[in-house]
Amino acid sequence: MKIGVLYEQREDTEEYPGENQDIESGRRRKRPKLDREQIYDALEKLGYEPSYIQLDGRDASLFAVAKEDVDLIFNLVDSYGGDDAKDLHIPAFLELIGAKYTGSGPHGLLLAQDKSLAKKIIGFHGLQTPFSMVVHRGRVDYAHDIKFPMIVKPVSEDGSIGISNDSVVDSVKELMERIHDLHEQFEDVPVLIEEYIEGREIYAAILGNDPPEALPLIELDLSKLPADTPRIAGREVKFDRDSEAYRVTKSAVAEDLDEKTTEKLQEAAKTTYRALKLRDYGRIDMRLSKDGTIYVIEANPNPWLTKGAEFAMAARGSERTYTQMIKEIVEAAVAR
């Protein structure tokens, strides 16, 4: 089977951004070069015929995809023309030309991208999510009464873009300043204000479709952060190599959770995955509070797939090799 590894060409980074370096380039992020290279190598080991298909943000490169002689496209495009908000148009185009591809479709990407809408859907399915409201310039959409502390972030960004230690606010003055800063930085993108939940940062990798499987849970351990630092996975934790927050945090399989709590977290993740129409693979981010309450924070339909990323870490925890993980993603897409 011929498989085209589809990606957008931007400045490459040789390392996994979540672990090794700052990936922010203005507003947008760069997908790691190793992501596509490791997937390509895994596809070769599996006996497939992989090839690279490159987008460069110009329409000609997109239209050329229709002429590619491949049986499946392994879609690694999470932006178009450097704009993350346009990632859903790539699978929409692939469907228009009748191409098979891995990962979530445009519907799932849209639902996951709009955090406010996703929270409403998650709540409808009986899951807990932090109380929130959305602020536009000159207008506030109230959902609930929220108490301080709050966390303030763009409503439609991912990869911790727009989130830093300053995102957690404790007063009206700090709240208004943060809203203003985000509206300036993100060109009037609506701002999501959420109740800040103190607790453990849990990631659930989901693999497959009918039924989806929740892999072993991963925890980003924030317990060693300085006392005056909010326990969030912001820029300092993920990308700022010179910060203490970066040095003292790490992800690992959450081995100390009891069986009942683990099952509840995995079920919440699978419910979220299905409710938001995700498919083939994805990651659900949650908070586990001190009293055992599970809060679904957001869904990531296209998490990084490098060997050092949390998704591959979870796959290893289930005794899968990296190559087996890629094989199952391919098989899930082909079976649809």
State where each predicted segment sits.
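Alpha-helix N-cap recognition
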Residues: 57, 170-171, 321
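Active-site nucleotide/adenylate-binding loops and adjacent lid/helix of ATP-dependent enzymes
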Residues: 1-7, 65-69, 110-192, 198-200, ...
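ATP-binding N-terminal substructure of ATP-dependent carboxylate-amine bond-forming enzymes
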Residues: 1-100, 107, 111-112, 137-142
